[in-house]
Amino acid sequence: MKPCIFTGSAVAIVTPFCGDGVDLEAFDRLIERQIQGGTDAIVVCGTTGEAATLSYNERMALIERCVRTVDRRVPVIAGSGTNSTASSIALSKAAQSVGVDALLTVTPYYNKASQSGLVQHFSAIADAVDIPVILYNVPSRTGVGCTAQTYQALAKHPNIAGVKEASDDFDLIQDTLNLCPPGFTVWSGNDGSTAAIMALGGKGVISVAANVVPREMHELTQLCLENRFLEAGTLQLKLHELIRALFCEVNPIPVKAAMELLGLCSGELRLPLCRMSERHLEQLSSALKPFRSSV
């Protein structure tokens, strides 16, 4: 059986900007806050980290900085997927060379590859590296999704460790868990589905909300891992309004606003993303109030 890269809550960490550049000092502070808050792994340069608007040099600077600052205290997972197989391989190999523990590779967006194309794409990336690869299925953003049969085929690859499943398709998730061997791990890609997916056999979440409430997301996943699902359900419900507010506009617009409201980093975004509406900002500010004392 393949070893599980992490169980629990991995933060999909935001990228703090400062003018035209990345604020690496603020990034260090965010990493330390996550580790102190009990986060079980850190995902750098994912969707929430605005990877699509980062240059190659910026991505590598963030990945290297994360590896150095974390210093082996928790696993570091680098987002290395693009809609070009060759570019994804190059970024994956570069991330491996600076010491990341695993890679997160999104389904190629815009191209709308067939299932055979997806198998070949992910297999080519996994062939090119010697560290675990996590698939990332988010069809609402990419325009294409994996089937359970595709996961079953990919699960045979020794370097493919599992999937961040952000489709919220529970038929797909159950089929995947039934078809794939136990060593193929499923992680929730949606904060609001964490307890439900873990009740089916998922091992944790790659979380947006953990940027704001790392302790609570860690606690939620630990309760699930301990089969304390009644308590987990209570905490999931407590987090519901906050999670809803964090997705009232497209991610990561609300979470960047939340980080600024809490004084954790600038809420600056890169175009084509822009700041959220005043109406939604009021909703977010209200949802944050019960958690301000824990931040």
Where do the PLM segments sit?
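Active-site beta->alpha loop and helix N-cap motifs at the rims of alpha/beta catalytic domains
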Residues: 2-11, 15-143
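C-terminal alpha-helical cap/extension of soluble enzyme domains
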Residues: 8-16, 33, 37-39, 199-202, ...
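Gly/Ser/Thr-rich beta-alpha loop segments that engage phosphate groups in nucleotides
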Residues: 10, 48-51, 81-83, 145, ...
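Alpha-helix N-capping/helix-start residues
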Residues: 19, 24, 56, 148, ...
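A general structural signal for well-ordered alpha-helical segments in protein cores
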Residues: 27, 59, 63, 88, ...
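Alpha-helical structural signal in soluble globular domains
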Residues: 37, 61, 65-70, 94, ...
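Short secondary-structure transition/capping segments
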Residues: 54-57, 90, 115-118, 146-148, ...
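Catalytic alpha/beta core domains of metabolic enzymes, predominantly
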Residues: 127-128, 139-247
